């Protein structure tokens, strides 16, 4: 009989134990919350009837709002699963620390990411490293948000030290995934203090964010994809820009597959079935107005009238977004994570696409690096900051800038990472030290 006390015997066991950390435990986070909160509450998305978006977009969610409850459960599922893995591998005496540490680091990476989300979303939460202990003594005090961030950073620092230089398999994280995630968490924590209107950030953590981002930038195994649209093609999963992505199973069962297309696709002509519930999910005008003329990111992100997509309805020469019948609600629809039907790609089935969900991309690390250099200054023309900020703009087909402000970085992050569940957290990060501005 396989049990927790006899499973963790070989490196193959360690590898098998960490595999579900890339999909199953994240499913309830990914299914509706990833974009519902990150983009709905961030005012990128609006929805008149979709109860997984409009409570966030309308700022009417409660502690019982479905996706919020699901996300809480998902994040603590990650914590408890990683605890079992970490303690199970540690308890193995037949393998060396050299063999065990990379798998412990993989689990601690996931736990660190989960706690970084818990800190930004709920603030004071329970920190737990032993699932059995929590079951035996379930009444536990929450820890201050500063301690939660510190815990997340310690996990990610361990991961950066012990994860392999190169991923052990496609889609698995490596030490640069950890450095990239550390750069985000350091940048966030730099602004946190007891005064939400301090208007300044901790320079030590800004420096740490810069150093962690530079570790990733200097690794030549990572580079921006040439074509922004390619980032969201199934056959481009685990590309040169991916630092951490959820890995969904082709033709997978519920809980192991990516369901986002169901909620984003605007009509069944795209999916080839009735699972196309995005006909009333639209871009907020506010985000569309932010795009500069010629920005190549708009069409791969949002579907507007007349936009053509050759990868959808391939047999018919592609799909063109057209206006709906008179009298129906229309708008600019979601395109990211919308991949088509099984006729377009045999890996797609009803309610299931295997496209990865991005959790961290190289482009974001470039923008983190630029923001860390900007720091507390009103603007910067620092050569390094401008080089990496403009790399992101160049791919988007936009003219380079000679200097940047926080507002430039805010807008660039919003458009680069739109529908990737990040913009609300950008606003929270800013509100840690400039709350009135964000309000």
Model-derived features with residue positions:
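Conserved, well-structured interaction surfaces
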Residues: 10-11, 15-29, 51-122, 137-150, ...
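Short coil/turn linking the two alpha-helices of tandem helical-hairpin repeats
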Residues: 119-121, 126, 167, 188-197, ...
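C-terminal substrate/ligand-recognition segments
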Residues: 300-392
